[in-house]
Swiss-Prot record:
The gene is botB. Changing residue 1191 to L: Increased binding of heavy chain to host SYT1, no effect on binding to SYT2 independent of gangliosides. One of its GO terms (biological process) is proteolysis. Belongs to the peptidase M27 family. A motif (Host ganglioside-binding motif) lies at residues 1260-1263. Changing residue 1189 to L: Decreased toxicity, heavy chain has decreased binding to synaptosomes and to GT1b. Proteolysis inhibited by EDTA and captopril, and by peptides that encompass the VAMP2 cleavage site (Ala-Ser-Gln-Phe-Glu-Thr-Ser and Gln-Phe-Glu-Thr). Translocation of whole toxin into neurons is inhibited by toosendanin. Changing residue 1263 to F: Greatly decreased toxicity, heavy chain has intermediate binding to synaptosomes, binds less GT1b. Residues 1080-1291 are annotated as: C-terminus of receptor binding domain (C-RBD). This is Botulinum neurotoxin type B. Heterodimer; disulfide-linked heterodimer of a light chain (LC) and a heavy chain (HC). At pH 4.4 in the presence of ganglioside GT1b may form trimers. Interacts with host receptor synaptotagmin-1 (SYT1); interaction is improved in the presence of gangliosides. Interacts with host receptor synaptotagmin-2 (SYT2). SYT2 interaction and toxin uptake do not require gangliosides but are improved in their presence. HC interacts with a complex including at least host synaptic vesicle glycoprotein 2 (SV2) and synaptotagmin-1 (SYT1); copurification does not depend on glycosylation of either protein. Keywords: Disulfide bond, Host cell membrane, Host cytoplasm, Host cytoplasmic vesicle, Host membrane, Host synapse, Hydrolase, Lipid-binding, Membrane, Metal-binding, Metalloprotease, Neurotoxin, Pharmaceutical, Protease, Secreted, Toxin, Transmembrane, Virulence, Zinc. Pfam families: Peptidase_M27, Toxin_R_bind_C, Toxin_R_bind_N, Toxin_trans. It comes from Clostridium botulinum.
Length: 1291
């Protein structure tokens, strides 16, 4: 139902309905009432400071602070007048309207409004509702003229206060009673929030947006609407009783350079979303899921038993039962009994936990947010006036398009939108610091380091060791995997999540049971003093700064001198640079000196060395050791040599203690004389084995992200600061030198200080790209070399034990496995002979780390210099070289990385490669690969098709370069040297085959070049080779144009995907590997190579009998096999079989099919196979009791007859790239009995005149045995492909 946001002024009179005097839960019957405003149903705002659990002196800044991991701002005068309270109220109304302005936000509000707490908690008997509970009811004071004041109870879902003592600390507070929380136990309870919209956090953007403008790594201030929505997600979790506040990530504080901070709850990681939930292991994910499911079952049990509301006899039991059924998405049978529908629960759970997240909302609202919950927070800023639409609007927030603020989130950028905020007074700012004091060399020198800047390293006790537990495996053991994703579009469009039942009355009897736990807040000391002789990253950063009151500074290469003397700044750049920077020049030489030193700065900052695969890192930034003293003193002097010896470990301040448990054993349940259950137990053990591998990998990734990658992140932050400090010192030196000249001398100096700043920032941006690549590569290298092998070692031990136990289990039960024991042993041996490969993208969605992992994991990708991929309705370069990609309007894109080029003038893609790539004479050693789909020729245009050539990709400069073109059934690769000499190599496919492997079908093209040869590989196999020894230098353009250019038909088009260029000649094995990787997918494909879809019409194609098709036999419920007609005009070119012939089948999803978020058919899905006949949907069945090896399939209208089976499992045909699949009939999804495979068989028929045999659409037990005997026999008649009608094939 539509959400209505109410409007108020603070001075509006109390009406006892929308404006009331409320006694909040923590007032505990003291008679402290607050003026409260109902901003929308069940949500109240109290424009007062949140004081519960605090002392009055807590509201003043002192030597102590509350949370040790943030900057805290105090102002005891905030909200101390009615005018200030009115501004707060109006601002909150505006923020709620901003939330409501988009469907996603309105749905969030709808679910909060309708997520009313259960009328009771764990103390209430099962058969009762009870409203006299502090987590359900609050009191309001009703006061009318001439009447005695009286209390009345009301139901509320959320009460929002102003802030507590700290203005920039926003928090959602749930209500505990005797140390139990309804918000965590399925019931849900009233939620409270302390919130301040004006003072917002600031974060930076060091890691993101390669190649973006120089402003893009400045500080960004948060959008208060997003801050509020973050808290509202906590509220939503609390109202549904799924708040996860008992699974902390605990910081390790063993060293003085580690953050001292409160534990981070899993609730925060789920609420933030993005990459952060990756820190929660898969087994923990599952335990949380199971706990919520168990709690919801408890609610079901209560609803089925509740008979009365003892605290309020006016409560209509049935109305509330119906409301709670709707809230929890329970189902009700004909007898009125409630139960949980697992699919509905699964959808609700995932929408709450993985759909509503800060990162999803930020993307939907186009708001800039932090990269991670762990991102550093900078001191907050005060937004000047959120009510001013020139500063902040309901539709766009700060990023107002009319003010050109929407690009790159300019409206949130501190450097750009300065009119939106003001810096806060340092007088009221408290920051928790570590004071590091030197006891030698520079005695008495202490530096203050903000706690936020220290290393966050999680303690190993933060992670569950559930993997070490033994597990019983039975025939019905369920999967533990929880897919932690919920597409945002599905969340917006899913009407099932919207309540269709009106809210019950909010009025009830007054609350008299004030049993509630009020949190008590204790202060912490603000500064911790440490004496140390270690020189850490923090001392080195401090040595690169200078006091603001000192202007005459100089650079030094001595770290100790920089600590001792405040006018000296440590520099890690070369001595030549330091000497030039410190050089004093005459006024006439000043401009030239400035130009030189600024250029030198850019050169120094961008120094990097390409290493020959040392420690799996191809790029190293050599000055990191000198800049931050990472590693140790010996590494500092020769960082590259030390790195070569020790690898990425040298960068870590703290080598983490890893939790890598011994994997617990499987206990296999025995079943007497039950073959099906025994086989199902074996299958479940093998499936659970994969889950153990996945869970172990997930545990390792969780520890890596929170113990290793956090250290590398701090190093990146440190290098960003170091480069900025170097730039600030240089700018100060330049300004000081300039200012000592006379006015006359200055007038003759032509210099632009803004230009200096711009060039320095540009140099820093370029350097940060190198640093990010280097540090990210080190982090992934540490994961792959130091962590994953330890996990694999434990997993292989587990596999060996499992294999032994399974083989013994088969031997013990061979009496019941007659005819199957050897096959089951073979299956176990095959399954356990290979390790499960590690894929980082399964465990985190951090695209930067995944990209680095992919580069690490493939020798090929380390040489890739252009890699076009789809993202957000555009093509981007994922090679890391940042090519500029312009996609014109006439190009069609889709999210399968495919793009379509037509003959239209604006159907074009322009790729401008990074100028850092040296691309001259590249033909001496380079490769190009891509997938292509070329449509079928037109029958009446065959001559043009054969003879006309058109270019599809062009990379030419001054008539030299390379191009790819098509002429008929030829793909042609052409090289042209600087003298105009041309060499070509081509691949030609046959168009006279009955069924072509290439026409309109995706195939993989790889072209390689070296000094001697140019080669073309198709689908991984070498097809053509040409000598190019006599060709000279080729100068290729840095610009690549994708466009159909030449003598072409106006309807001509092609499809392409996965275009890549490599700066090496790929080997045969490289190409085969790449073909196999890019061919693989989790879903099945149709005849053309596109995803196989549910609810789409297909003609069925038998790969073993290509010229056959299926037709419903007249007056008979069977499918006869007929021969495809042949098209041939006595042409030497045209010869093909019709594909669009026979019945058009439709794959329908069976209820428990895996793929529930889209219409793609995945491997092992359970399906129905249907088709339309006489405008009625028919289905493919098999008789339950057929006795022969083969039986004709029964084709009939859909029915519930128990004579037939209709459950089909659609399986991948082959491990190798293929578009074929097999259709396996089973009794049902739980059964291990394989009834037979769908295929073609010749049946004997007795005719009137003579006997004959005829082929029919059948189910076959023979195919089952043959597939096991020869699993990859291409000619088997049980291998099927599905042909949809396509614009690229006309008949």
């Amino acid at each position: 139902m539509p959400v209505t946001i109410n409007n108020f002024n603070y001075n509006d009179p109390i009406d006892n309905n929308n404006i009331i005097m409320m006694e909040p839960p923590f007032a505990r019957g003291t008679g402290r009432y607050y003026k409260a405003f109902k901003i929308t149903d069940r949500i109240w705002i109290i424009p007062e400071r949140y004081t519960f659990g605090y002392k009055p002196e807590d509201f003043n800044k002192s030597s102590g602070i509350f949370n040790r991991d943030v900057c805290e701002y105090y102002d005891p005068d905030y909200l101390n007048t009615n005018d200030k309270k009115n501004i707060f109220l109006q601002t909150m109304i505006k923020l709620f309207n901003r939330i409501k302005s988009k469907p996603l936000g309105e749905k969030l509000l709808e679910m909060i409004i309708n997520g009313i707490p259960y009328l009771g908690d764990r103390r209430v008997p099962l058969e009762e509702f009870n409203t006299n509970i502090a987590s359900v009811t609050v009191n309001k004071l009703i006061s009318n003229p001439g009447e005695v004041e009286r209390k009345k109870g009301i139901f509320a879902n959320l009460i929002i206060f102003g802030p507590g003592p700290v203005l920039n600390e926003n928090e959602t507070i749930d209500i505990g009673i005797q140390n139990h929380f309804a918000s965590r136990e399925g019931f849900g309870g009233i939620m409270q929030m302390k919130f301040c919209p004006e003072y917002v956090s600031v974060f930076n953007n060091v890691q993101e947006n390669k190649g973006a403008s120089i402003f893009n790594r400045r500080g960004y201030f948060s959008d208060p609407a997003l801050i509020l929505m973050h808290e509202l997600i906590h509220v939503l979790h609390g109202l549904y009783g799924i708040k996860v506040d008992d699974l902390p990530i605990v910081p390790n504080e063993k060293k003085f350079f580690m953050q001292s901070t409160d534990a981070i709850q899993a609730e925060e990681l789920y609420t933030f979303g993005g990459q952060d939930p990756s820190i929660i292991t898969p087994s923990t994910d599952k335990s949380i899921y199971d706990k919520v499911l168990q709690n919801f079952r408890g609610i079901v049990d209560r609803l089925n038993k509740v008979l009365v509301c003892i605290s309020d006899p006016n409560i209509n039991i049935n109305i509330y039962k119906n409301k709670f059924k709707d809230k929890y998405k329970f189902v009700e049978d004909s007898e009125g009994k409630y139960s949980i529908d697992v699919e509905s629960f699964d959808k609700l759970y995932k929408s709450l936990m993985f759909g509503f997240t800060e990162t999803n909302i930020a993307e939907n609202y186009k708001i800039k947010t932090r990269a991670s919950y762990f991102s550093d927070s900078l001191p907050p800023v005060k937004i000047k006036n959120l009510l001013d639409n020139e500063i902040y609007t309901i539709e766009e927030g700060f990023n107002i398009s009319d003010k050109d603020m929407e690009k790159e989130y300019r409206g949130q950028n501190k450097a750009i939108n300065k009119q939106a905020y003001e810096e806060i007074s340092k007088e009221h700012l408290a920051v928790y610091k570590i004071q590091m004091c030197k006891s030698v060399k520079a005695p008495g020198i202490c530096i203050d380091v903000d706690n936020e800047d220290l290393f966050f390293i999680a303690d190993k006790n933060s992670f569950s060791d559930d993997l070490s537990k033994n597990e019983r495996i039975e025939y019905n053991t369920q999967s533990n995997y929880i897919e932690n994703d919920f597409p945002i579009n599905e969340l917006i469009l899913d009407t099932d999540l919207i309540s269709k039942i009106e809210l019950p009355s909010e009025n009830t009897e007054s609350l008299t049971d004030f049993n509630v736990d009020v949190p008590v807040y204790e202060k912490q000391p603000a500064i911790k003093k440490i004496f140390t002789d270690e020189n850490t990253i923090f001392q080195y950063l401090y040595s690169q700064t200078f006091p603001l009151d000192i202007r005459d500074i100089s650079l030094t290469s001595s770290f100790d001198d920089a600590l001792l003397f405040s006018n000296k700044v440590y520099s890690f750049f070369s001595m030549d640079y330091i000497k030039t920077a410190n050089k004093v020049v005459e006024a006439g030489l000043f401009a030239g000196w400035v130009k030189q030193i600024v250029n030198d700065f850019v050169i120094e900052a961008n120094k990097s060395n390409t290493m020959d695969k040392i420690a799996d890192i191809s790029l190293i930034v050599p000055y990191i050791g000198l800049a931050l003293n990472v590693g140790n003193e010996t590494a500092k002097g020769n960082f590259e040599n030390a790195f070569e010896i020790a690898g990425a470990s040298i960068l870590l301040e703290f080598i983490p203690e890893l939790l890598i448990p011994v994997v617990g054993a499987f206990l296999l349940e025995s079943y007497i004389d039950n073959k099906n259950k025994i086989i199902k137990t074996i299958d479940n053990a093998l499936t659970k084995r994969n889950e153990k591998w996945s869970d172990m990998y997930g545990l390792i990734v969780a520890q890596w992200l929170s113990t290793v990658n956090t250290q590398f992140y701090t190093i990146k932050e440190g290098m960003y600061k170091a480069l900025n400090y170097q730039a600030q010192a240089l700018e100060e030196i330049i300004k000081y030198r300039y200012n000592i000249y006379s006015e006359k001398e200055k007038s003759n100096i032509n210099i632009d200080f803004n230009d200096i700043n711009s060039k320095l920032n540009e140099g820093i941006n370029q350097a940060i790209d190198n640093i990010n690549n280097f540090i990210n590569g080190c982090s992934v290298s540490y994961l792959m070399k130091k962590m994953i092998p330890l996990a694999v070692e434990k997993l292989l031990d587990f596999d060996n034990t499992l294999k032994k136990n399974l083989l013994n289990y088969i031997d013990e039960n061979k009496l019941y496995l007659i005819g199957s024991a050897e096959y089951e042993k073979s299956k176990v041996n095959k399954y356990l002979k290979t390790i499960m490969p590690f894929d980082l993208s399964i465990y985190t969605n951090d695209t930067i780390l995944i990209e680095m992992f992919n580069k690490y994991n493939s020798e090929i990708l380390n040489n890739i210099i252009l890699n076009l991929r789809y993202k957000d309705n555009n093509l981007i370069d994922l090679s890391g070289y940042g090519a500029k990609v312009e996609v014109y309007d006439g190009v069609e894109l889709n999210d399968k990385n495919q793009f379509k080029l037509t003959s239209s003038a604006n159907s074009k893609i322009r790729v401008t490669q990074n100028q850092n790539i040296i691309f001259n004479s590249v033909f001496l050693d380079f490769s190009v690969s891509f997938w292509i789909r070329i449509p079928k020729y037109k029958n009446d245009g065959i001559q043009n098709y054969i003879h006309n050539e058109y270019t599809i990709i062009n990379c030419m400069k001054n008539n030299s370069g390379w191009k790819i073109s098509i002429r008929g059934n030829r793909i042609i690769w052409t090289l042209i040297d600087i003298n105009g000499k041309t060499k070509s190599v081509f691949f030609e496919y046959n168009i006279r085959e009955d069924i072509s492997e290439y026409i309109n079908r995706w195939f993989f093209v790889t072209i390689t070049n070296n000094l001697n040869n140019a080669k073309i590989y198709i689908n991984g196999k070498l097809e053509s080779n040409t000598d190019i020894k006599d060709i000279r230098e080729v100068i290729a353009n840095g610009e690549i144009i994708f466009k159909l250019d030449g003598d072409i038909d106006r309807t001509q088009f092609i499809w392409m995907k996965y275009f890549s260029i490599f700066n090496t000649e790929l080997s045969q094995s490289n190409i085969e590997e790449r073909y196999k990787i890019q061919s693989y997918s989790e879903y099945l494909k149709d005849f053309w190579g596109n995803p196989l879809m549910y609810n789409k019409e297909y003609y069925m194609f038998n790969a073993g009998n290509k010229n056959s098709y299926i037709k419903l036999k007249k007056d008979s419920p069977v499918g006869e096999i007929l021969t495809r007609s042949k098209y041939n005009q006595n042409s030497k070119y045209i010869n093909y079989r019709d594909l669009y012939i026979g019945e058009k089948f439709i794959i329908r999803r069976k209820s428990n099919s895996q793929s529930i978020n889209d219409d793609i058919v995945r491997k092992e899905d359970y399906i129905y196979l249907d088709f339309f006949n006489l405008n009625q949907e028919w289905r493919v069945y098999t008789y339950k009791y057929f006795k022969k090896e083969e039986e004709k399939l029964f084709l009939a209208p859909i029915s519930d007859s128990d004579e037939f089976y209709n459950t089909i499992q659609i399986k991948e045909y082959d491990e190798q790239p293929t578009y074929s699949c097999q259709l396996l009939f089973k009794k049902d999804e739980e059964s291990t009995d394989e009834i037979g495979l769908i295929g073609i068989h010749r049946f004997y028929e007795s005719g009137i005149v003579f006997e004959e045999y005829k082929d029919y659409f059948c189910i076959s037990k023979w195919y089952l045995k043959e597939v096991k005997r020869k699993p990859y026999n291409l000619k088997l008649g049980c291998n099927w492909q599905f042909i949809p009608k396509d614009e690229g094939w006309t008949e």
